[in-house]
């Protein structure tokens, strides 16, 4: 007969070893290959103390086409919780220039041929409740939101293009216009950003005025109305192409060309909020922004305006409006630029 053996006293050392063995028997935890990066501080609405019923939208930019008298508005400074453009453009590498030599012209010809298909004309013609002023107000709020997320200029251009193209197809109620703005931003970021903003972050910026289901439903509507045709040629693409072109031709030093590109990008950001500039194609706006940036930086060899093969009348008309836009939003522009560029540029360039 088998009887249980008497238990022997266990030493403290043995008990400690047993606990170690128990810990080693735990199931292994599978670690994610791509750890999710979380922000240390949550994004806050740009308007920290919204009024009752206010969704956080505030005026930041002045628009020459909205009947302004040319003076900066009290809220036009981008210093209202918005950081300037992050430094200079990325330095060009030999691989970048070699890639441009191999494929630059063919990519430019392909994107240039697509402009007419993706260019929205008179996007507010069918909008009884959305005006040029409300569009300017929305984008003046959306541009700093885009910058607060640290997103690329390409995604901003795609956001505005998606917004305007949808406006040409469907009337939008005034109380849904901000929802359309953040939905367009989300669609654009999903195309080009590695880490697009989360839906709950975008909804938080709207101060809880909309639900997740409303945003997702509108996203589906926008995609179907645009027939999932989203890869529009942008000002960002043409700015980069013209910068590479002038460098390849030896028309500017690398540092000068990159500074002009950053300044031109800031001017283009201002133009995105003004409905008057929707009549110009992205390639025309890009070459004019770059030419104006050269004059503001007083570069000895400005970019050739005829690189985009646009009529002289259209070039001068666009340049004149851009100069007026810069003069009206001089305070905002200085807050958008790095300090080293602000010290070099003149906010009253001559068009001669």
Regions found by a protein language model. Give the residues of each.
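Acidic, serine/threonine-rich low-complexity regulatory regions at protein termini
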Residues: 1-182, 186-352
